[in-house]
Design a protein with these regions (language model features):
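N-terminal helical cap/lid subdomain that shapes the substrate entry/recognition surface
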Residues: 2-9, 13-94, 102, 115-118, ...
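Structural motif
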Residues: 84, 140-145
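Short active-site oxyanion
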Residues: 104-107
Length: 152
């Protein structure tokens, strides 16, 4: 039996694609940009929100300054709508409860912004379920997040 299990968040524990897609489309609509079907966003996600923003932004709107502004706008919209449709996948709450009952320690590491990762985990799961929840932190390389969780 495993002693510890590390989980990704989006697309693993929680189905977040609808809220991500809807938020992206709200940003696109505000700029008069093309909007995409939710199914298309499945190809846009997986490498963090900055990459998602780059992928839904038109090619002529991808300068570093434009992407930074669009990212800030997306964060604001998503922060207001990240609980609209998000839900745990079927069977996930039961799986996590069984692992916890078996004494398995669990953690969540996500490329979602840390504040958003913590917020959705707190909303959908018991507070004592995970030993640690970490999302992407500004100026911290993704692979370094595992080191943040190590005891000092």
């Amino acid at each position: 039996m495993y002693k510890t299990v590390l989980f990704d968040l989006d697309g693993t524990l929680l189905n977040t694609i609808d809220d991500l897609a809807d938020s992206a489309n709200r940003v696109c609509a505000a700029h008069g940009w093309p909007q995409y079907e939710t199914a298309q966003y499945r190809y846009f996600v997986g490498n963090g929100i900055p990459k998602l923003v780059e992928r839904f932004s038109p090619a002529d709107c991808r300068s570093p300054a434009q992407l930074a502004a669009t990212l800030a706008e997306f964060d604001q919209v998503y922060g207001a709508h990240m609980h609209d449709k998000t839900a745990p996948y079927p069977g996930i709450p039961e799986l996590l409860a069984r692992l916890k009952a078996a004494g398995v320690k669990m953690a969540v590491f996500s490329n979602k912004a840390d504040e958003f990762a913590r917020a959705v985990v707190a909303r959908y799961f018991d507070a004592d379920l995970f030993e640690i929840v970490r999302g992407a932190l500004p100026d911290v390389p993704t692979l370094s997040l595992i080191h943040i969780s190590e005891p000092t």
